């Protein structure tokens, strides 16, 4: 039971730490990549939605 609690605490701490990294600024040398970097977290959602569209297209044949 203690191990599960420890694992939950570790996961929460890493989630909080990673969310602070999410709002970090790029160095000035890479400032021109800001629009691409802002779009990058959304890209996996496009593949997720594409899977549903593909399944719908296949089932209607």
From Swiss-Prot:
Keyword annotations of the record: Chloroplast, Membrane, Photosynthesis, Photosystem II, Plastid, Reaction center, Thylakoid, Transmembrane, Transmembrane helix
An example Gene Ontology biological process: photosynthesis
GO cellular component, one term: chloroplast thylakoid membrane
UniProt cross-references to SUPFAM superfamilies, sorted A to Z: Photosystem II reaction center protein K, PsbK
Annotated compartments: Plastid, Chloroplast thylakoid membrane
Propeptide: 1-24
Record InterPro entries: PSII_PsbK, PSII_PsbK_sf
Membrane topology, record value: Single-pass membrane protein
TM ranges: 40-60
Signal peptide: none
Cytoplasm recorded as keyword: no
Job description of the protein: One of the components of the core complex of photosystem II (PSII). PSII is a light-driven water:plastoquinone oxidoreductase that uses light energy to abstract electrons from H(2)O, generating O(2) and a proton gradient subsequently used for ATP formation. It consists of a core antenna complex that captures photons, and an electron transfer chain that converts photonic excitation into a charge separation.
Recorded family membership: Belongs to the PsbK family.
The protein's assembly and partners: PSII is composed of 1 copy each of membrane proteins PsbA, PsbB, PsbC, PsbD, PsbE, PsbF, PsbH, PsbI, PsbJ, PsbK, PsbL, PsbM, PsbT, PsbX, PsbY, PsbZ, Psb30/Ycf12, at least 3 peripheral proteins of the oxygen-evolving complex and a large number of cofactors. It forms dimeric complexes.
This protein's name: Photosystem II reaction center protein K
Organism: Panax ginseng
Annotated gene: psbK
């Amino acid at each position: 039971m203690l191990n599960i609690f420890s694992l939950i605490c570790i996961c929460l701490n890493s989630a909080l730490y990673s969310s602070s990294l999410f709002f970090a600024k790029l160095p000035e040398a890479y400032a021109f990549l800001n629009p691409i970097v802002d779009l990058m977290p959304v890209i996996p959602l496009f593949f997720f939605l594409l899977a549903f569209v593909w399944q719908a297209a296949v089932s209607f044949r």
